[in-house]
Amino acid sequence: MTKITLSDLPLREELRGEHAYGAPQLNVDIRLNTNENPYPPSEALVADLVATVDKIATELNRYPERDAVELRDELAAYITKQTGVAVTRDNLWAANGSNEILQQLLQAFGGPGRTALGFQPSYSMHPILAKGTHTEFIAVSRGADFRIDMDVALEEIRAKQPDIVFVTTPNNPTGDVTSLDDIERIINVAPGIVIVDEAYAEFSPSPSATTLLEKYPTKLVVSRTMSKAFDFAGGRLGYFVANPAFIDAVMLVRLPYHLSALSQAAAIVALRHSADTLGTVEKLSVERVRVAARLEELGYAVVPSESNFVFFGDFSDQHAAWQAFLDRGVLIRDVGIAGHLRTTIGVPEENDAFLDAAAEIIKLNL
């Protein structure tokens, strides 16, 4: 077959020179770079999933339940229990990972001539998804401590009048939390909708922004995922919680039968075993505290985190430091922020290997 490159294709001009999103997938002993839950699913969950798939396999010649009604019922029950906010399936929408959730929201509320504003550094897919939906992305820098500078944030929102504002809490890659008071201040000055990205909410003791939904029915959407705390990254299931009108909006842009029967069934099984799965959250939180404390003892600067990862520095060359960890068999994440790296919290043995490497690397003055 004739060899061609992207430059030979009639690609959209704004995509030329861009790079595909993705963390390195390398064959190393210790992988702490993608914020997965390191604990495998329980035997009971696996057995339940196998039995469920066996049951539905004879119906795979049929399209799946188009609107994922049973799954949305289960998600609503979980959110009601986890946040204390009473919701029903009419408040829930599910898709293939929170990335598809965010993409659908941008398709419905962004687009040509519209803007989305986010506080950087934050989840790197926000500007990528904005570009893919022809939505102009406005990046507002966080403060030196990586927290949102509220004075700057409110001033920029008033000046730029964005159609969408992203607030990620706990923030990825830094792990800090934006308070409900500050989220309300943002909502009150934002002319359009505010999407609060709570992908890591289960790791944080801070209250969920879902508690504000009744107060701001036309402006607030809370996005979540089952990829992190739920030990379900391979299942690719994201969802949002909002007023039912927002579900009506994304139904205008969603693809037909977008969630497969297998995805829906697997997510329902995971929710059925949520007590066991989420039992690992406390273990990971304890390990996060231990890892952060040890890094500080070694002389690293650590950003306070309420997630399943730790953001740390300061390095004069963070990529050289990343390579030094990799050379010691530990894969962590260089997210491109000067002087800093991010490590996912793994099982104790993985964290020990990471900390042993960190103890050696601090002496290299990288």
UniProtKB/Swiss-Prot annotation:
Record's keyword terms, sorted: Amino-acid biosynthesis, Aminotransferase, Histidine biosynthesis, Pyridoxal phosphate, Transferase
Keyword match Transferase: yes
Required cofactor names: pyridoxal 5'-phosphate
Residue numbers carrying N6-(pyridoxal phosphate)lysine: K228
EC numbers: 2.6.1.9
GO MF annotations in UniProt: histidinol-phosphate transaminase activity; pyridoxal phosphate binding
Pathway recorded for this protein: Amino-acid biosynthesis; L-histidine biosynthesis; L-histidine from 5-phospho-alpha-D-ribose 1-diphosphate: step 7/9
Entries under Pfam families matching the protein: Aminotran_1_2 (PF00155)
GO biological-process terms attached to the record: L-histidine biosynthetic process
Reactions the enzyme catalyzes: L-histidinol phosphate + 2-oxoglutarate = 3-(imidazol-4-yl)-2-oxopropyl phosphate + L-glutamate
Top EC class, one word: transferase
Cited InterPro entries: Aminotransferase_I/II_large, HisP_aminotrans, PyrdxlP-dep_Trfase, PyrdxlP-dep_Trfase_major, PyrdxlP-dep_Trfase_small
Gene3D superfamilies linked to this entry: Aspartate Aminotransferase, domain 1 (3.90.1150.10), Type I PLP-dependent aspartate aminotransferase-like (Major domain) (3.40.640.10)
Keyword Transferase: yes
Subunit structure: Homodimer.
Family statement drawn from the similarity comment of this UniProt entry: Belongs to the class-II pyridoxal-phosphate-dependent aminotransferase family. Histidinol-phosphate aminotransferase subfamily.
Classification via NCBIfam families: hisC, PRK03317.1
Protein name: Histidinol-phosphate aminotransferase
Upper lineage: Bacteria, Bacillati, Actinomycetota, Actinomycetes, Mycobacteriales
